[in-house]
Amino acid sequence: MKMTSVRPQAPGDIQRAQAIVQVAQQCFAKYKDYHLALQDGYQIFAPNVPQDIYHFASIQNFLEAQTTFDVLHPSALLYNKVSNGYQLAGIMFSAPANFSEDQLNERFPLSLAPWHLHTNICLPAGDYDETLFPGNSLFG
């Protein structure tokens, strides 16, 4: 995994981040009930594999994030497994893998939070979409 560098705080970074967080709180409040996330098309990635944090991913929102940044449409919702289901712990946004740090900084100030890029990911040979996200998949 590669992390973006930390930038010095620029004028307006805090205000910009606060505006994003204020909108994100609407999303956070909505998806405290993980059933609503499932109803809205989020799917649990690898639900049968024990994890520290479970990613409820939205392929539609991920694809949308390749061209626009919409705080109300996070690519993934992050949940902790609890005795009666899942407890919302955070939200995650995506950007194109080829974005520069300047482009990422336009989405959210790098002075306040880093972005990360997954590198050296092992994927199965063949049709990635069908292998990773088969039509009858319970996740992905």
Language model: regions and residue ranges:
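Primary mode marks residue(s) on the alpha4-beta5-alpha5 output face of response regulator receiver
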Residues: 1-140
